[in-house]
Structure formats: structure tokens, C-alpha cells
Amino acid sequence: MSWKGFTKALARTPQTLRSKFNVGEITKDPIYEDAGRRFKSLETEAKKLAEDAKKYTDAINGLLNHQIGFADACIEIYKPISGRASDPESYEQEGNAEGIEAAEAYKEIVYDLQKNLASEMDVINTRIVNPTGELLKIVKDVDKLLLKRDHKQLDYDRHRSSFKKLQEKKDKSLKDEKKLYEAETAFEQSSQEYEYYNEMLKEELPKLFALAQSFIAPLFQGFYYMQLNVYYVLYEKMSHCEIQYFDFNTDILESYERRRGDVKDRAEALTITKFKTAKPTYKRPGMGPGGKDATASSSSSFSSKREEAAAEPSSSTATDIPPPYSTPSVAGASDYSTPSAGYQTVQTTTTTTEAAAAQYPQAAFPPPPVMPQPAAAAVTTPVAAPVAAAAAAVPVPPPAPAPAAAPAAEHVVALYDYAAQAAGDLSFHAGDRIEVVSRTDNQNEWWIGRLNGAQGQFPGNYVQLE
């Protein structure tokens, strides 16, 4: 839109709103309004004819192309499986030569149909689609003229309202007289333009309707006979379709059922057609007697591995944690008949204790009394008097290694996806690494973990210990 057109549209805006809401004096011409409605009907009819003709030609061409593609698909299905057989002696010819021949024959018939109907499609485009397109161009030009007439009506009503308002003003100043003269001039000019376009359209639109009617009616009639000719060609070609593979004398459903035989039953009898894959389900405690058994098999291997790891502590754990000071850590196990079970495990696996026992004789180190202090405090606080007296007579053994830092948090890896089923549950996906907050030795129970800042409980048999 040009600047001039924009300013005109802006000046017409108040009058446009008054016209829409029927406020003030609005010019109405019943004869023109009736002609305008007939013109809109003509425009709709012409568009529909052009669209229907175009859709029809596209549908016929698409139908034939689809039939060719269908024949190609049947040929590919009937062909034997390509590739070299692993055992040439057991190779069987699985192709359907008769079916391939029938599909090829049907394909040739469709190709012949395309050639015969190509001329009919060209006739439809030449006599229906193209003339209708020319009519639509004329209709668009006339529509622009109708729009211009409506704009002239808005200008006419606008200038008339302004002129009438200034004319009814009683005490007019020199400035008002000047405005009145300008408004009268604009009103006369807009009145002449409106009358010109309004009278021209009222006179020429009926002539256009008569010409369009004499133009569109033969198009509809010709389009009908063109479709009839297309259907006749299709019927003649397909009725003389002589393909021995098909039995045209019997019902199509009966022929299909006879050819299919018991293929469906044999296919459904195959085991591979009933194979289903699904992840193990887990029932929360207290939901039924079968909840525990349903997931025990999926986690048995992980439970056995975890129990073996618990029965054999690693050397790194034993060396990092020093033995309690209240136990005879530097004496041999053979001189004491009743050492504690925990001391025996630490003594056999701790390299620091064995080195100290080899350096200092057993007779020089009497067993110290059992002290109630914890192991970490016994290393750094003064010892009891008997121990101090014994230590004064012999060289002081090297200090025990400092207590190791707190063990790292335990983590598990998710084996399956789990969605929270109740408030307090922790959702995760397969492969997520979850920090364990609290757990039991039974993987069929619910553990507590933390993932991405969220803490909650989850089934133990859905995860694997790292």
C-alpha cells in the first residue's frame, strides 16, 4: 500500500466503524446490494468449477500411478528372496512365477490406460480448467472495482456528514465559512465519483451475469461428458482384461479364501509369532504374595555377587582402617587362645601389623588391658600405665597409619526404568547412577537413594551395585 492509500484508509476509519455499527447516515442502494450478492455467488461458482476440474484430473492420474506401484509391490513380493543360500542343496524355489506374470500383465494394462486417458486429461485442462481460470481473472478485476465503489461510498458519507454539520452551525466565523466551502467542494466531488461507480456497476453487472451464465453452463455440461468418456475408457479396458491367473467367474472373496487356504492358521501356529518382550514387573511390599517371586529371578545373579563380595573383604579396606588400640595388635596370634573374631580378621590381612610383629619379639610385649576408648582415640591419647612401662623398656614401634577418610558414598546403577508409583518414590531411567542413602542386604526390598538432588525409595532389584 502506498502512502497515499494509507492516508485515505486512515481518513476512512471513523466512517468505516460507523458503517459497521450502523451509526449515523449510511447510504444504501438495494439494487446494487442485490447485484453484489449475485456477483459473490458467481465468484464462488467459478472457483469451485476450477478446483473440481483440477482435483478430478489429479485423482485420475494418481489412481493410475497407484495401480502401477501396486503391481510393482506384488512383483517384489512374488520374487524369490535374493542372496546366496548357505546350503545350495537345500535351496528351494520360493518365487511365484504365475503371480509375477499376472502382475506384469496388469502393469501393462495400466500403462495402456495412461496413454489412452492422457488425451482426455488434456481435453479437460484445455476446455475446463484453462477457461475457468480466465473467468476467475475477470472476476478478480471486477471485484477490485466493487471495492473501489465501496470506498467511494465511505468518502461520500464522510464528506456529507462533515458538510451537513458545518451547514447547521448557526454562528459561523470567517474560518468556519472557509471550512464550509472546502467541505462543500469535497462533498460534491465525492458525490460525483460515487454516483459514477455505483451507476456503472448497477448497469453492467447484470450483463456480466448473463455472459457468465452462458459461459459456465456449457462448461459444467462438457465436464460431465468428459468424465463419462473417462469412465467408459476405464470400463472397456478393464472388462477385456484377460489374465489367466485371475478367476473372474467366481466371487472375489471366495476366490481369495480359496487361494489363501490355511496360510493364516499355519502362520499363527509358529512360536515366533507369539514371542513377547517385557521388563520384569515389581510389586510393592504388602501388595500380594506374588510380588516378591515376580522379580527374584531377575536379580539373583547380582545378589550372589554381592554376598561373595561381603564374605571376602578386600585388602585395600583392611589396610586403610587400623586395628583398635585396645586389642593386642602387635602380638602373634599363636600366644593367645581367645582373640576376638574381629582381631583375627584384621591380623591376617593387615600388612602393618605383620611387620610390627616380625620386628619386635612376642615376650617383650605383654598384652595390654582392654581399654574402653575407641580405636581412633587410642592412637592419639596417652596409654595406660602398664603399657607405658613396657614401652619404656623396648624401642617404640612405628605409629599405626592414620585413620582413613570416611568411605565414599555407595552407588548403584539402574537396570530398568522406574516411574514413581506413590509419594516418596524415586523415579529413574536405565543406566542412571544412584547414590545409596540406606539399604538392606535383601535386594527384593525397598532401598533409599538420591538422584539429581531428589531423595526417595526404590525397588532394590531394579539396580545393580557398582
Curated annotation (Swiss-Prot):
Alphabetized UniProt keyword annotations: Coiled coil, Phosphoprotein, SH3 domain
Residue stretches making up the BAR domain: 17-269
Asked whether the UniProt record includes Coiled coil among its keywords, one would answer: yes
Q: Which residues form a coiled coil?
A: 31-67, 177-204
Q: Name one GO biological process term.
A: endocytosis
Name positions with the PTM Phosphoserine: 298-299, 301, 303
- What is a GO molecular function of this protein? protein-membrane adaptor activity
Please list the residue ranges that the record marks as compositionally biased, kind Low complexity.
Answer: 294-303
Q: Which stretches make up the SH3 domain?
A: 407-466
Q: Which Gene3D superfamilies match?
A: Arfaptin homology (AH) domain/BAR domain, SH3 Domains
InterPro entries, alphabetically? AH/BAR_dom_sf, BAR_dom, BIN3/RVS161-like, SH3-like_dom_sf, SH3_domain
Q: Which Pfam families match?
A: BAR (PF03114), SH3_1 (PF00018)
- Which SUPFAM superfamilies does the protein's record reference? BAR/IMD domain-like, SH3-domain
Cellular component (GO) terms are:
actin cortical patch; actin cytoskeleton; mating projection tip; medial cortex; mitotic actomyosin contractile ring; Rvs161p-Rvs167p complex
Q: Where is this region: Disordered?
A: 280-342
PROSITE patterns recorded for this chain? BAR (PS51021), SH3 (PS50002)
Q: Does the keyword Endoplasmic reticulum apply?
A: no
Its annotated function is as follows: Has a role in DNA damage signaling as a part of stress response processes.
Protein name, UniProt field: Protein hob1
Q: Which organism is it from?
A: Schizosaccharomyces pombe (strain 972 / ATCC 24843)
Q: State the gene name recorded for this protein.
A: hob1
